[in-house]
Regions:
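Low-complexity, Gly/Ser/Thr/Pro-rich intrinsically disordered linker/tail segments
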Residues: 250-271
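Second-shell loop/turn segments in exported
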Residues: 138-143, 163-171
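Short, basic/aromatic beta-hairpin or loop at an interaction surface
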Residues: 30-44, 183-198
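Boundary regions of SH3-family modules and the immediately adjacent low-complexity/disordered segments
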Residues: 1-2, 6-40, 49, 53-57, ...
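Active-site nucleophilic cysteine motif
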Residues: 156, 168-187
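...with weaker cross-activation on analogous glycine-rich loops/strands in unrelated enzymes
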Residues: 189-252
Length: 271
């Protein structure tokens, strides 16, 4: 087994035989990808039309680098993006399945210096840790906290119906913290991957009565995303759900989960 660390600061172990080792400059190139897949599952085709040969299937969250095209090619291929795959091949993906990457993936190099994640990311972006969230919100949402919160909730809803998979972080299966951290990531803010609040990351505890849409609700070993009006979205392994569903904090709501309400112990916010 090999110990690995993801670009969002998550440590784990992988069977070494499943890894492909590359030079650091190749990794830098990959981490400079400018597009992220937002469709649940999307084919990469050999041609910019549905008759193209299927080269591979990608999942939500996969990143790609757009390849340059001439003005004539771009016009002829309207509705499609020419992308570079990790194996060096190029293919085509529908534009509607892609969005700009809103998060920075190179802080992993600064983490080698022993910096906390926020400090490592700030060093990479040539800023300070306290400015990470305001700058992300300013860049992608015009400085509007409400717009950011709404976007996080919408990103989480895209996973509705996805089955629960412990350790999962894709449209094929996702766990509770995978759902919440992915929703934030797609909106430009990297939070801690597990179901807890720790120092060195953007999220901090706020009073329950101050919770707003987009905040995180913490239970022992579990986390959900608050949607507003008493409802929250989460990925749960409960037998009655088995995936991403919406439940409620309100006893009068048919989606009420009393077992979770009783053990809710913290609300987390990045604001």
């Amino acid at each position: 087994m090999a110990e690995v660390v993801s670009f969002y600061g998550y440590h784990g172990y992988v069977n070494q035989r499943e890894l492909q080792f590359v030079r650091e400059e190749e990794l830098w190139e990959y981490l400079g990808a400018d597009l992220v897949l937002v469709g649940r599952a999307t084919d990469v085709l050999s041609l910019p039309k549905v008759q193209g040969v299927r080269m591979m299937e990608l999942e939500r969250g996969d990143v790609l680098r757009r390849q340059p095209e001439t003005a004539e090619e771009a016009e002829a291929h309207k509705g499609w993006a020419k992308v570079l795959l990790t194996d060096g091949r190029t293919g085509y993906v529908r534009d509607v399945a892609l969005e700009p990457v809103k998060y920075e993936m190179t802080a992993v190099f600064s983490q080698r210096e022993g910096l906390a994640f926020n400090d490592a990311l700030a060093e990479t972006l040539d800023t300070t840790a306290d400015k990470l969230v305001p700058e992300a919100v300013a860049r992608w949402y015009g400085g509007s906290e409400d717009a950011f919160r709404a976007a996080v909730c919408e990103q989480a809803k895209r996973y509705m119906g996805t089955e629960y998979r412990w350790g999962g972080k894709s449209g094929r299966g996702i766990d509770c913290s995978g759902l919440v951290s992915s929703a934030y990531m797609q909106c430009g803010v990297l939070i801690y991957r597990d179901a807890k609040i720790i120092e060195g990351w953007p999220m901090h505890e706020v009073a329950f009565e101050n919770k707003k849409p987009g905040d995180a609700l913490f239970f022992p070993g579990h986390v959900a995303l608050y949607l507003g009006e008493g409802r929250y979205i989460h990925s749960t392994g409960a037998a009655a759900s088995g995936g991403v569903v919406i439940n409620s904090l309100e006893p009068s709501d048919p989606l009420y989960r009393e077992d979770l309400v009783k053990c809710l112990y913290a609300v987390g916010s990045i604001f």
